[in-house]
Amino acid sequence: MAKFIQHIGLVAPLDAANVDTDAIIPKQFLQKVTRTGFGQHLFNDWRFLDDAGKVPNPDFVLNLPRYQGATILLARENFGCGSSREHAPWALTDFGFKVVIAPSFADIFYGNAFNNQLLPVTLSEADIDTLFQLVKENEGIEFVVDLEQQTVNAGGKSYAFEIDPFRRHCMINGLDSIGLTLQHEHNISAYEKQQPEFLR
């Protein structure tokens, strides 16, 4: 996995609370088990006016020209609620998002985000209100999200957030569960060599 230390990116404001995983990636697109290819269906029922996904909704935020290429999603409370599908962070990262900033996240989505190198940043509702206003009033504004310093820098101000030290360590070093295991490969090999032949 790629390391996440600092990210600078354009911000798209999704001004909606309780965005559930079925809205993020509708159930009809869940047939695959690989992580790629879901971005084209991200927010499908909101981004498109037809079932085939051919007619863009001109009023949806991700279809507006000013937010094309956004890599940071600004959202409202309880983002990622609903079913526990891991396809939700897959769709967000496949679309190009690296960070989601919101007042709160559903627990399962929050964990799945870290597992897929998508950084969920929690800020107060007051800070989120300020950031929404900032983005809407300043076309093309970019935020600097620094995981080492645990800050979001925007509009000349710094907003502090907290990430569990273990999850922070994993993201900064690009470690998933396999990577964590491989850090102990030498000890695992030494242990295996000590086992009786019939257990090897």
UniProtKB/Swiss-Prot annotation:
Gene3D superfamilies: Aconitase, domain 4 (3.20.19.10). It catalyses: (2R,3S)-3-isopropylmalate = (2S)-2-isopropylmalate. InterPro entries: 3-IsopropMal_deHydase_ssu (IPR004431), Aconitase/3IPM_dehydase_swvl (IPR015928), AconitaseA/IPMdHydase_ssu_swvl (IPR000573), IPMI_Swivel (IPR033940), LeuD (IPR050075). Its EC number is 4.2.1.33. Pfam families: Aconitase_C (PF00694). GO terms for cellular component: 3-isopropylmalate dehydratase complex. GO terms for biological process: L-leucine biosynthetic process. The keyword Hydrolase does not apply. Transmembrane segments: none annotated. GO terms for molecular function: 3-isopropylmalate dehydratase activity. Keywords: Amino-acid biosynthesis, Branched-chain amino acid biosynthesis, Leucine biosynthesis, Lyase. Pathway: Amino-acid biosynthesis; L-leucine biosynthesis; L-leucine from 3-methyl-2-oxobutanoate: step 2/4. Heterodimer of LeuC and LeuD. Catalyzes the isomerization between 2-isopropylmalate and 3-isopropylmalate, via the formation of 2-isopropylmaleate. Belongs to the LeuD family. LeuD type 1 subfamily. HAMAP family: LeuD_type1. This is 3-isopropylmalate dehydratase small subunit. It comes from Yersinia pestis.
